[in-house]
Each structure stands twice: as C-alpha cells, then as structure tokens.
Amino acid sequence: RIEKASSIKYPTMYVEPSILISGSTNSLDVGILYARTIPLIVHDSIHVVIQISAPLVAYGLKGTIHAILAHEFLHYLELVTRLSKTELLSDEISSNLFENVYSDNTRLLEPRSVFNDNMLISHITKKFPSGFRDYKLEDKVIKFWIEQKLPVSKISLDTNTVKLNAIQLSNIKLDELLLQQLEIIKTKNSKLRKKRLY
C-alpha cells in the first residue's frame, strides 16, 4: 500500500521477535518503539532497514500497522535525503522522550507530499499528531507480551544512534531514481509547509 501510494520501493524490513522499550536512564519517561529505521553498515557501505517489532504485527490493527510503517517510510526518505547530502553527522539526540517527539515531527516530510492515498494520510495524521499513541495496542502489548515475560529490548534514547566514518559515507550508493523522486517530493513538501504557515 505504501509503495503504491508513493511510487517508491519500500526499504528492506524485518520483524524483530521482541518489543523495544526506550527511555532516559534518569527519568520515568518511557516509550514503546513498534518500529524504527536503522542505517546498517555492511562491507563498509550503508543500507537502511526498517525494524518492526513482533507485537505490532501480532496485536496492531491494519490501519495502525500502515500508519507506523508509513511513518517509518518518512524516516527512511529523510535519512536517504540526509545521506545524499552527507548531512548525517549534525543530528542531535536528546535523552528526553518529549524532545525527541518534537524533533521527529519537525524533521519529517509532510505525508501529503509523499503519499497520494487519503486514507493512509488520515491514518498517519491521526496516529501521529505529536508522537504515536495507541492505548489499546499499548494495553495488549503490556498484558500479552511484557507481562508474559516475552522478549523485551531496552535502549536509552541517547544511545539509539549509529556512528559512521568517512569511508562509509563515501561508499554510499543511492538509487538515482529515488533521488529524483525525492527532489520532486521536497518541492511539494516546501509548498505544503509554506501554505501551513500562512
């Protein structure tokens, strides 16, 4: 559905057989990560993959799954844009969940600039007004996954990073068609953001 709505191939993805819990080591601020976009280093080259948690697949409603996968797709496009311009090193990571949600919302492309599927856009905007929250899904994950002692991976928000050296950055091979599509999307995105400001 996401490929059809964007005319762009979805990146490699895999299902992680655990739930990822993120938070700050010095705070009660904790969040469940149902999916995340990860740049992996393979043979001194960078490949971007989407990691999906098993509980999302097991307990998420179809619209929720589509919204999360579309949101991660926006992260993928943002990351590819930054990789193509080698702007990757300047990103700041906060250990505060609220600051990360704000940063997430200001960096990503407008869904309407990427997707031509109104239902998918509606799912994204309703599920991610300011960070993702689905209380029914959270309750199911806590009750049927975490409390059942199924695998849980804990990470600190400020360690959810990948360090790249100059060789890895120079070995990046990006799809030319994707870069052309991103240029069109960025133009649409800029127009949408200007409209929203006025």
Region annotations inferred by a language model:
Residues 26-63:
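Active-site scaffold of zinc-dependent metalloenzymes
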Residues 67-80:
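Active-site recognition of the HExxH zinc-binding catalytic motif
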Residues 1-3, 37, 51, 78, ...:
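Polar/charged side chains located within well-ordered beta-strands of beta-rich proteins
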Residues 81, 85-127:
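Post-HExxH zinc-binding segment in Zn-dependent metallohydrolases
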Residues 63-64, 68, 89:
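Short, conserved micro-motifs enriched in small and acidic residues
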Residues 1-11:
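Zn2+-dependent metallopeptidase catalytic core
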Residues 10-24:
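Propeptide-to-catalytic entry region of secreted or membrane-anchored zinc metalloproteases
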Residues 114, 118-198:
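Pan-zinc metallopeptidase signature
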